[in-house]
Amino acid sequence: RTLATMAACSFMFSMVQMSLTTYLVTYLHDDLAYGMVSAGLLLSVTQMGGIGGRIAWGVVADRWMGAQKTLALLACLMALSALATALLLPVMPIWGIWAILLVFGASAIGWNGVYLAEVARQAPEGKASVATGGTLTFTFLGVVIGPPLFGALSSAFGTYRAGFLALVVTSSLCAWVLYRLKPSAVMPAPE
């Protein structure tokens, strides 16, 4: 059950990650009138957050929270960041936008290492590669499905804000599911 839940959440996490990196520049340019270079720089800030997040979240999971609670925290941060991104205004101070996008990147791009380590830990003994491959099927399905859904919602509502608001819903659902998931022991190997 834990591996299935992790796979489902990775599906949604990858939807958030790929939608963010696919549409952020266009959103900043089209909806907020940023120049392409400035919008690209802000995407770089998001990516830098992801680099730092991959390292920092591993430490947080190992030393303090455990993987499941860290992933629940990351889902909360994704939801809050997606909401803040949907509510961005052109008159906001640039440092505020940098901060929002840094946290968004740290959570939406930085989740993968904690997730993969937990999948390997939850796998039956000797089956980590099978569990990882199986769950990554769902992860990459989210990569394929997420951006077109985000784009369709944005087109239907005439703004990229709608897509970011949809990410709030998916991230919040994952946070709730992961928070309620009972920490489970490592599964024994099948006989």
Give short role names for the model-derived ranges.
Residues A120-T159:
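A late C-terminal transmembrane helix in Major Facilitator Superfamily
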Residues Y27, D31-L32, R63-W64, E118-A123, ...:
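Helix-to-coil boundary motifs at intracellular loop junctions of multi-pass secondary transporters
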Residues T2-G58, N112:
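Extracytoplasmic gate region of multi-pass secondary transporters
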